[in-house]
């Protein structure tokens, strides 16, 4: 079992989510720094960096990486077509005009032009940051999953292998993180093969864990006992494979039906600070380490509304593990 004092905590920071919430990303990030996270996952958004074909703008990501370096925060960098936050696939408009970015009958990388341009973008990001202290490179987000939030669009295992090969060529000692979703329905075994494929490709596997997922405006799906047993078994398999077992998208913000950001009120049924603390403790007892909380931009938004319940809960979170 993970000794609680050795548990490492982190979060994912998304400048895109700041935009959705109407917040300045620099000011928001500076509110996150005092929380003293061990890790922060950053996102290399294709549509932000290469708005115009062949012209790359790294101003935002450069600033975020510099801030992490300044404050000795370990960096996880997510890169690819598919990176954290809606709409999952972050295509520049010029790509959407020349490629099929909505198909579900085949993998998106089946479009040779799209695959070629994506690899050019990934290579640019790798070369930009290959000498920076990136502790893990995340290739795509839920790289092999066909999740509903991405409208069933997906990438092939072969394309993920190409991206990893490209990274290893330029950063031979790089460590690879692949993220996986876990199904809440016991009869759906599709995540098992994806999990095993990911183990073969990565140094660390990050599981995205939610405990209340909306099915309509009033009802939520909650994990059954098999869900926790599967998480325990997956951890055992990762340990036996000498891979790191991370929890990388751990619910710490509301997820509500048909809401890009849930900001109509300050409290929702899908989560709470108390539920978040319970989830972190449960994952720690299952030996997942580090644990990256999902929703730091939301906590800052809450603070701006005069409510400190999330910021205070996160601030206190590390004390039991100190």
Which stretches of residues belong to each language-model region?
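Boundary/entry segment of secreted carbohydrate-active catalytic domains
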Residues: 1-32, 37, 43
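Hydrophobic faces of well-ordered beta-strands that scaffold small-molecule active sites
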Residues: 7-13, 38-42, 75-79, 135-139, ...
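Acidic-and-aromatic substrate-binding clefts and catalytic sites of carbohydrate-active enzymes
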Residues: 12-26, 46-59, 83-87, 144-147, ...
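Substrate-binding cleft of secreted/luminal carbohydrate-active enzymes
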Residues: 76, 244-322
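Glycoside hydrolase catalytic-domain groove-lining segments
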Residues: 153-260, 311
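Aromatic-lined substrate-binding rim segments of carbohydrate-active enzymes
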Residues: 26-34, 41-98, 151-178, 221-227
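Short, acidic/polar
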Residues: 18-34, 118-126, 186-198, 272-282
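Active-site groove signature of glycoside hydrolases
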Residues: 82, 87, 107-114, 118-152, ...
């Amino acid at each position: 079992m993970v000794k609680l004092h050795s548990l490492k905590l982190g979060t994912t920071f998304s400048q895109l989510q700041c935009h959705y919430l109407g917040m300045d990303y620099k000011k928001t990030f500076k509110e996150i720094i005092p929380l003293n996270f061990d890790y922060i996952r950053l996102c290399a958004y294709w549509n932000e960096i290469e708005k115009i074909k062949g012209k790359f703008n790294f101003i935002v990501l450069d600033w975020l990486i510099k801030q992490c370096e300044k404050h000795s925060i370990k960096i996880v960098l997510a890169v690819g077509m598919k990176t954290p936050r809606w709409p999952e696939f972050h295509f520049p408009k010029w790509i959407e005009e020349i490629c099929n970015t909505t198909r579900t009958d085949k993998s998106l990388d089946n479009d040779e032009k799209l695959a070629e341009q994506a690899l050019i973008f990934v290579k640019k990001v790798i070369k930009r940051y290959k000498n920076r202290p990136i502790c893990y490179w995340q290739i795509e987000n839920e790289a092999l999953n066909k999740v509903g939030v991405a409208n069933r669009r997906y990438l092939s295992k072969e394309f993920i292998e190409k991206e990893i090969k490209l990274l290893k060529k330029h950063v031979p000692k790089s460590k690879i993180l692949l993220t996986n979703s876990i199904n809440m329905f016991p009869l759906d075994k599709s995540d098992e093969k994806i999990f095993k494929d990911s183990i073969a490709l990565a140094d660390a596997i990050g599981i995205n864990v939610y405990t209340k997922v909306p099915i309509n405006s009033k009802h939520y799906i909650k994990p059954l006992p098999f869900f926790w047993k599967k998480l325990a078994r997956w951890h055992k398999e990762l340990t036996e494979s000498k891979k790191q077992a991370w929890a990388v998208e751990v619910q710490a913000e509301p997820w509500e039906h048909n809401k890009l950001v849930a900001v109509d009120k300050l409290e929702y049924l899908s989560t709470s600070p108390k539920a978040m603390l319970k989830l972190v403790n449960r994952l720690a007892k299952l030996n997942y380490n580090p644990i990256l909380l999902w929703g730091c931009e939301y906590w800052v938004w809450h603070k701006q509304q005069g409510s400190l319940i999330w910021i205070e809960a996160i601030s206190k979170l590390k004390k039991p593990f100190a």
